[in-house]
């Protein structure tokens, strides 16, 4: 099997893993890396979410250990799976991967976007703090005023127990309080 490492920030990396690699027996995900969010490194992506190919879960390692991790784990391919960084930062990570003999990959939208039979509006931005949540709330209110049914989907986030939060539905403010 091909050994890969997923560079992430505890969100899109998990999403990409779930959609592309979770059930692929030809691939072994050696680890996720953690960047941007403190307190994530040292944890594991839980086996309940990682699936039967990963009965011990998947380690989450600090991105600063990238070069050593690639050598130690004999990683053949590095998959970049987060945003909010400059082109120069992405290319720096690519250079580290290539210097260690690994391929560097960005997954395209055909493999990572959720399929829907309904119309979809994506709210994205170049970095954290740009107002994605506020924009999504504004759009939701506008669409509801037009009589449409609205649902908001977000990729997994690392706050709390990932296994217990595998699927969360917030239909009312009380649902937020219960979470």
For the regions a language model picked out, list residue spans one by one.
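Short internal beta-strands
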Residues: 27-39, 153-154
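N-terminal beta-loop-helix "entrance" segment that forms/cooperates
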Residues: 37-57, 161-167
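Phosphate-bearing ligand-interacting subdomains
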Residues: 46-110
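Glycine-rich adenosine-cofactor-binding loop
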Residues: 2-25
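ATP-dependent carboxylate-amine ligase catalytic core
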Residues: 142-179
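Phosphate-binding P-loop
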Residues: 112-118
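Conserved beta-strand elements of the Class I
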Residues: 3-5, 122, 151-153
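Glycine-rich phosphate-binding P-loop
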Residues: 122-139
């Amino acid at each position: 099997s091909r050994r890969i490492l997923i560079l992430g920030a505890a969100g899109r990396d998990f999403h990409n893993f779930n959609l592309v690699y979770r059930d692929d027996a030809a691939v072994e995900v050696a680890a996720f890396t953690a960047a941007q969010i403190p307190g994530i490194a040292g944890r594991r992506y839980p086996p309940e979410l990682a699936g039967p190919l990963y009965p011990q879960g998947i380690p989450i390692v600090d991105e600063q250990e990238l070069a050593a991790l690639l050598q130690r784990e004999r990683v053949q391919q590095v998959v970049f799976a987060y945003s909010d960084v400059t082109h120069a930062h992405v290319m720096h990570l690519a250079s580290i991967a290539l210097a260690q003999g690994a391929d560097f990959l960005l997954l395209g939208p055909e493999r990572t976007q959720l399929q829907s039979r309904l119309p979809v509006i994506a709210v994205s931005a170049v970095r954290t703090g740009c107002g994605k949540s506020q924009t999504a709330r504004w759009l939701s209110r506008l669409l509801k005023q037009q009589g449409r049914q609205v649902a908001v989907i977000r990729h997994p986030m690392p706050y709390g127990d990932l296994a217990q939060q595998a699927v969360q539905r917030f239909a009312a403010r009380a649902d937020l309080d219960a979470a």
